[in-house]
């Protein structure tokens, strides 16, 4: 299936948010600010150019665009990285380094200098030229890589890039997706990575785009099963509660509602319950705990925190704003 980019999506269109300069006083945005501030104050390994920090900074820009309040941490991080992806020369098209590209795309809303995105563009186009579609080995790639491919393709009207990322998605889906259960993995967090990335791509693409329709169909199938895996306390998790899985799935459900691809009456209660659960994972300073390691089966504890989970928390909060009265 091939589709054309007839409509240009607005840069950064995954961000359903008020104007960047307008602060929005509401309980959701208040806790977003508190959580992002806590992470940049108390978090660990904040300088590294890696997928976890990239996921945080993508969410951090979402927080800035939603609340109008900045902690002024993302642009210095991007500058320190010299706009480069943390590539492994032995595996230059691995998905994880491309997560940094999504953070660069997010910050380019405020810093549109072409140099910011040039290394990302070069890497994605070089990958597409290989004609190989099996670089994505795990469903995590739908968050690590698909958003960067999709947004660059939409911004640049690059049909080749859009086609390539869709074919990579189809290859991954053929290898890892269970059409009967709607799950990508037995591990709930892994499914969180998948639905989070699909929701981002859906928000980026024009509504009449057939690839968007396919992503939405898969998201609906996963969401149908994942809603029944929500714990009584509102969390999702592979082994006990996991704030990362919960934030990712809460984001995906809320974004799906906002995009018009998930039924609001059906899924909003799960979104609200997930968001309420996440509030209980914040300590007194706003640091998000109960974060399981990436795709781990090891139970999390109250003191376990990670940048990637905070980023997903901030993305979830952003999508909650249009769904929350008074925000």
What do these predicted regions represent?
Residues 8-9, 17-18, 145, 291, ...:
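Low-complexity, intrinsically disordered/propeptide-like segments
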Residues 1-23:
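Secretory targeting and sorting signals
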Residues 139-143, 150-250, 262-293, 304, ...:
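Extended ligand-binding clefts on enzyme/binding-domain cores
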Residues 44, 108, 133, 150-154, ...:
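Short amphipathic alpha-helical segments at helix-loop
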Residues 83-186:
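Extended ligand-binding groove/face enriched in aromatic
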Residues 24-123, 137, 238-327:
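CBM-like carbohydrate-recognition segments
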């Amino acid at each position: 299936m091939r589709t054309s980019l007839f409509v240009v999506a607005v840069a950064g269109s995954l961000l359903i948010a008020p104007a960047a300069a307008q602060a929005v006083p509401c309980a959701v945005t208040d806790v977003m600010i508190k959580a992002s501030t806590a992470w940049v104050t108390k978090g660990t390994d904040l300088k590294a150019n890696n997928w976890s920090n990239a996921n945080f900074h993508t969410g951090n820009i979402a927080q800035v665009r939603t609340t109008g309040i900045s902690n002024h941490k993302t642009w210095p991080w991007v500058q320190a990285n010299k706009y480069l992806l943390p590539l492994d020369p032995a595996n230059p098209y691995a998905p994880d380094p491309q997560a940094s590209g999504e953070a660069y795309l997010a910050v380019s809303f405020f810093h549109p200098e072409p140099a910011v995105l040039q290394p990302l563009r070069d890497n994605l186009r070089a990958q597409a030229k290989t004609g190989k579609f099996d670089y994505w080995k795990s469903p995590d790639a739908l968050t690590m890589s698909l958003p960067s491919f999709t947004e660059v393709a939409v911004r640049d009207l690059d049909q080749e890039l859009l086609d390539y990322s869709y074919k990579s998605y189809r290859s991954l889906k053929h290898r890892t997706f269970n059409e009967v259960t709607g799950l990508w993995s037995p591990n709930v967090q892994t499914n969180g990575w998948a639905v989070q990335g699909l929701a981002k791509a859906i928000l980026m693409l024009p509504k009449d785009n057939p690839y968007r329709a396919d992503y939405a169909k898969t998201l609906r199938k996963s969401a149908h099963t994942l809603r029944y895996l929500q714990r009584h306390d509102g969390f999702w998790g592979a082994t006990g509660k996991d704030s990362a899985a919960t934030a990712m799935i809460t984001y995906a459900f809320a974004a799906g509602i906002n995009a018009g691809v998930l039924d609001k009456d059906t899924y909003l209660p799960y979104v609200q319950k997930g968001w309420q659960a996440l509030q209980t994972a914040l300590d007194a300073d706003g640091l998000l705990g109960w974060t399981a390691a990436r795709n781990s089966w090891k139970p999390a504890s109250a003191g376990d925190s990670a940048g990637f989970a905070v980023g997903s928390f901030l993305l979830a909060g952003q999508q909650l704003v249009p769904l929350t009265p008074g925000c």
